[in-house]
A protein has these predicted regions:
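Intrinsic-disorder-associated interaction segments
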Residues: 8-10, 33, 37, 72, ...
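Charged, low-complexity surface segments at secondary-structure and domain boundaries
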Residues: 21-30, 144-152, 172-178
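Alpha-helix boundary/capping residues
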Residues: 13-17, 24, 108, 165, ...
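Non-catalytic C-terminal interaction segments of nucleic acid-processing enzymes
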Residues: 156-200
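Metal-dependent nuclease catalytic cores that hydrolyze phosphodiester bonds in DNA/RNA
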Residues: 1-75, 200
Length: 200
C-alpha cells in the first residue's frame, strides 16, 4: 500500500514528494509560522460551538493507494479548514487553500466520510473521537479574517487528478513527466470542478 498525505499532494510537486519519501530527514522542521498557525486555529476553535473535534483524519483508498486527509475543525453540520494569514497573502496561497478544501470535500462526498481524531493528538492524551459526517456536509475555509464556502461540482474529476499524481509519485520518471505538464497548474486545471464564494 502506497500512502500519501492529501495536503502534500496539493502543495508539493511530484518530485518533491518522491524525494521526501526516499529522504524523510530532508523535510523541514516546523517553523514559527506553523506554530502561529496552530495558535490561530485554536483561537478560531474557541469561538465555534458544537465542535466534535479538531484534527480529525479521514482516509481515502483506491486499490494500492491510500490518501490521508486531516480536517482542522469538525462540527456536526460543517467542516472548517483554518489558514492563518500575515499581511497581504499572495493569490497562490488562497488558491492552494481552496483547492485543498475542494479535494478533502471531494473525498468525503465519495463516501470516505468517517473521521477520527488524529493519532498524534491521541498520543498527547486527547480523547479519541469519531464521526461519520454527511457526504454533502458544508465545507468552510477560514483564510485569515475572511471566510469562504467551498462547493464541489465534480468530485470524481478532482479525485482522479490527484490519484494520477499519487501514482506518478511512485517513480522518478513518472514524477518528472507529471510535473512537466501540471506543476503550478493544478488550480487552473481543476477550476471547472469546484467553486467558492465569500460568506459573512
Amino acid at each position: 500500500m502506497n500512502t500519501f498525505s492529501a495536503k502534500d499532494l496539493v502543495t508539493r510537486s511530484c518530485m518533491q514528494i518522491r524525494m521526501f519519501a526516499e529522504h524523510p530527514e530532508r523535510k523541514q522542521q516546523p517553523s514559527q509560522m506553523v506554530e502561529y498557525g496552530e495558535k490561530f486555529q485554536r483561537a478560531v476553535a474557541d469561538t465555534i460551538p458544537n465542535i466534535v473535534g479538531e484534527e480529525m483524519r479521514g482516509t481515502y483508498t483506491n486499490g494500492c493507494l491510500s490518501i490521508h486527509f486531516s480536517n482542522d475543525i469538525v462540527c456536526p453540520d460543517k467542516i472548517i479548514e483554518v489558514k492563518s494569514v500575515v499581511g497581504n497573502a499572495p493569490e497562490w496561497y488562497l488558491r492552494s487553500s481552496v483547492l485543498q478544501c475542494a479535494f478533502y470535500k471531494s473525498m468525503i462526498m465519495q463516501g470516505f466520510n468517517h473521521l477520527e481524531t488524529a493519532s498524534f493528538l491521541v498520543n498527547q492524551g486527547y480523547e479519541r473521537k469519531a464521526i461519520n459526517v454527511l457526504p454533502w456536509i458544508n465545507y468552510v475555509l477560514i483564510f485569515g479574517e475572511e471566510k469562504f464556502k467551498i462547493e464541489v461540482e465534480s468530485p470524481n474529476a478532482i479525485i482522479n487528478f490527484f490519484l494520477r499524481k499519487a501514482e506518478a509519485c511512485t517513480d522518478w520518471n513518472l514524477a518528472r513527466n507529471f510535473d512537466f505538464v501540471n506543476k503550478h497548474r493544478e488550480y487552473e486545471i481543476l477550476s471547472d470542478y469546484f467553486k467558492y464564494h465569500m460568506i459573512f
